[in-house]
């Protein structure tokens, strides 16, 4: 059926009036499309391209800012780790110094206590020796006076006690 239509059109010849009408209509339609559709479409495409370009630029700037923030954060983290390490080191040094001070102070206190104890012991020993010396002197006098049956004078008594104490001192030294 299509073939008969085409054959009939060719047999009659070309209708130049219709052909020109179609071409003029096509050109008018093309001008209208260009004026009302093509220009707004190209404007819209240009705006879209500009927006995409701006979005890409904004994304690049945001990426750069993010990288800068990451670098700043890494630097701050590194600095805080360094500061923490320094604080720990200082605390350790202070602790060691306090430990040494405490040990030194305790050692000095022990030495002082030992010295005081030695002084006290020496003083007590001397007091005990003096007391024993007096007791021995009194006992010696009593014994001597009973043996001799006479009273010794104070000088005789003192000489007797001194000689007795010297004898005791020599006995203690030999031990």
Curated annotation (Swiss-Prot):
Q: Where in the cell is it found?
A: Cell membrane
Could you name the Gene Ontology cellular component terms for this entry?
plasma membrane; proton-transporting ATP synthase complex
Membrane spanning residue stretches: 13-33
Q: Per the record, a Pfam family?
A: ATP-synt_B
Sum up the protein's function in the record's words: F(1)F(0) ATP synthase produces ATP from ADP in the presence of a proton or sodium gradient. F-type ATPases consist of two structural domains, F(1) containing the extramembraneous catalytic core and F(0) containing the membrane proton channel, linked together by a central stalk and a peripheral stalk. During catalysis, ATP synthesis in the catalytic domain of F(1) is coupled via a rotary mechanism of the central stalk subunits to proton translocation.
According to the record's subunit comment, the protein's assembly and interactions are: F-type ATPases have 2 components, F(1) - the catalytic core - and F(0) - the membrane proton channel. F(1) has five subunits: alpha(3), beta(3), gamma(1), delta(1), epsilon(1). F(0) has three main subunits: a(1), b(2) and c(10-14). The alpha and beta chains form an alternating ring which encloses part of the gamma chain. F(1) is attached to F(0) by a central stalk formed by the gamma and epsilon chains, while a peripheral stalk is formed by the delta and b chains.
Q: What is this protein called?
A: ATP synthase subunit b
The organism of origin for this protein: Ligilactobacillus salivarius (strain UCC118)
Q: Which gene encodes it?
A: atpF
